[in-house]
């Protein structure tokens, strides 16, 4: 699987354009805003966009999803249904951050633990990793050893858990029980900031040590 990171919104959110090199079929993960910028990247790439994938329901990860889905005529998949209240609350999220109003969004398909997503010859595994939000999912390409982790884990940090229905202990369990076992050599693309590996975070991330700081 190939990827290109497209930073969007004032939150510098890592929207990812991912694709299968053999078929040139592609997906967008977490198009949080700046729809025109994303359209330009997709159109310049020469790829065929097939779907939009969402890790969770926060505005900075989904803000341009509806516009892009309509523009390209593609479905939206994810997150897990527990994040429905976030997607239905997008207008309130917009007002809270002083951004242009974003209408409620209902995906074409909710995702669950164990689901798979096909992009040409690429297969992504879906893992449900609650804690930052209750319906947060991540996408893992086992062959490429590449993980798109949303706001679950960052280089040197983890997602906030002080939002409605966030749970810090659940977040840490998601990381330790579901992500770290994927392997130390797995590279992850976080929702914000630089890439890292699960092995580096296992050893150095202060939130994953025995004495953990808490947001």
Curated annotation (Swiss-Prot):
**Example of a GO biological process term:** methylglyoxal catabolic process to D-lactate via S-lactoyl-glutathione
Query: Which cofactor does the UniProt annotation name?
Result: Zn(2+)
Annotated disulfide bonds: none
Q: Which reaction does it catalyse?
A: an S-(2-hydroxyacyl)glutathione + H2O = a 2-hydroxy carboxylate + glutathione + H(+); (R)-S-lactoylglutathione + H2O = (R)-lactate + glutathione + H(+)
Its EC number is 3.1.2.6
Q: How is its activity regulated?
A: Is inhibited by Cu(2+).
Q: Which Pfam families match?
A: Lactamase_B
The Gene Ontology CC terms held by the record are: cytosol
Give the keywords, sorted. Answer: Detoxification, Hydrolase, Metal-binding, Zinc
Which InterPro entries does this one have? Answer: MBL_Glyoxalase_II, Metallo-B-lactamas, RibonucZ/Hydroxyglut_hydro
List ligand-binding residues for Zn(2+) 2: 60-61, 151, 192
Gene3D superfamilies the UniProt entry points to: Ribonuclease Z/Hydroxyacylglutathione hydrolase-like
What is the similarity comment for this entry? Belongs to the metallo-beta-lactamase superfamily. Glyoxalase II family.
Protein name per its UniProtKB record: Hydroxyacylglutathione hydrolase GloC
Task: Name its species.
Answer: Escherichia coli (strain K12)
């Amino acid at each position: 699987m190939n990827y290109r990171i497209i930073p969007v919104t004032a939150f510098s959110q890592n929207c990812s354009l991912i694709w299968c090199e053999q078929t040139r079929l592609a997906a967008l993960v977490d198009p949080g805003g700046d729809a025109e910028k994303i359209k330009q990247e997709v159109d310049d790439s020469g790829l065929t966009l097939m779907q939009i994938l969402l890790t969770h329901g926060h505005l900075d990860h989904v803000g341009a999803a509806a516009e892009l889905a309509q523009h390209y005529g593609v479905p939206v998949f994810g997150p897990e249904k527990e994040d429905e209240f976030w997607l239905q609350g997008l207008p309130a999220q917009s007002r809270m951050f002083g951004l242009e109003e974003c209408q409620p969004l209902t995906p074409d398909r909710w995702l669950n633990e164990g689901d798979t997503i096909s992009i040409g010859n690429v297969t992504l595994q879906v893992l449900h990793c609650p804690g930052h939000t209750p319906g947060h999912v991540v996408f893992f390409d086992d062959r490429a050893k590449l993980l798109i982790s949303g706001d679950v884990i960052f280089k040197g940090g983890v997602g906030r858990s002080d939002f409605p229905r966030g749970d810090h202990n659940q977040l840490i369990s998601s990381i330790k029980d579901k992500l770290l076992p994927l392997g130390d050599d797995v590279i992850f693309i976080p929702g914000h900031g630089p890439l890292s590996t699960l092995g580096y975070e296992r050893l150095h991330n202060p939130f994953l040590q025995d004495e953990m700081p808490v947001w």
